[in-house]
Amino acid sequence: MVNRKETNLDGVKAMARTLLYTDINKTAYSPMIVQHPFTNTGFTMVMKNGTPQCIDITADSNALHEWRKMVCQQIDSSKSAFEIYMMTNKPYGMTFLKYASHHLSKKDFSQILADAWIRSENPNDDPNLPQSKLLSMFQSAEPKHLMSQDELNTLKDLDSTVTVYRGVTSFNAKNVKALSWTLDRSVAEWFASRFDEDGTVYQAQIDKSHIYAYFDGRNESEVIVDPKYLMDITESESMDNSFDITM
């Protein structure tokens, strides 16, 4: 639960420095592409004697030290938790929030949650955050700081029972009962057909009381739901071989 009235910025900074000193995970494309909370590439720029220089932080321990020193200075000079969060590598936004949450005010927590969720490519399948944790995050958030006024109005104006859609491919076909659905069937169709796949569109019913957020920042008409309250989940009628899902 997030109960702080004010953010403990020093606590957020300390947590961010801990993330900074985690190992850099190399990939098949390293040093060009790496995995780390504060960078997605092994190449970075640092200032040496007033001159910017490109260094490879995966190959030189001194270069890695210089880079971490530079990022530490940026963390320490930050004026807000959101500023520190924006320094993180996109795939690690939700991880940052997970570890920073007990230092954050409800307002900061809610604003970072909304941004991190939208920026993440596939937050429903984040291995660091089980569905129960993701759901508790949205349940703890303050709607007025989680959504824009237009988004709040859209959520408020929904019928008491809402039809929602979800498009899946072979990549996430086993995760139909996820938090993320859409009010727009065409959006679900796009998700089902991306990556040149012939995926599946599902539709379901859910009571509005079990919808925790509506996001339209990516024009996806996305709703965040409590999956256990989804009803009548079926393959969409326009797809072949309509069938019910049994759980």
Roles of regions detected by a PLM:
Residues 1-163, 170-179, 185-246:
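Conserved NAD+-utilizing ADP-ribose enzyme module
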